[in-house]
Amino acid sequence: VPQLCVYKMPRATCIHFVHSAQTSYIYTSTSSDTTRQQLNYLTDHYFAPLHLTPPEALPKAKEQFRNKYLAYNKGFFIFHHKSLYLLNTNLVIEEKNPSEVIDIDFLVVSFGCWMRYSDVSKQIHPRQVILSSDFPYSYRQIWIAECKKAHIPCHDVNTQGAFLCDL
């Protein structure tokens, strides 16, 4: 069963797109050396016990990637007909017609975003918000409260552990 996983990692965003036990892809916000160290931990404690082949690291140097399972372009991912947006910068807020708001399945909010959900929701309407482990505590509390008020499920990786979702 294909899965989306967002792991709790110190000072990093880590998104794992699992197609099968043999095929998966991982995006991390850290340098390749740090990513390799973190993947060693995941391999020993997660992939090996579950008989999963270690994932292919998505290249950060490229802003685009596409194969038959996964496509991404500048923070926007499509995997098994599900959309995910990685919000690690501030959006340029434009006054939009409500019909122009982008509907997505998952919004992963990470370090680099200094906006509130109430501002982001003017352009993006997620079905699920996931707060990455590197997202600052002060903003985390605001997002949790605003998501609750908007009736949007919000998963905090720091307090609730890894986000795992069958697709």
Describe these PLM feature segments.
Residues V1-C14:
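Hydrophobic alpha-helical transmembrane segments in integral membrane proteins
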Residues H16-L167:
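Extracytosolic and intramembrane catalytic regions of membrane-associated proteins
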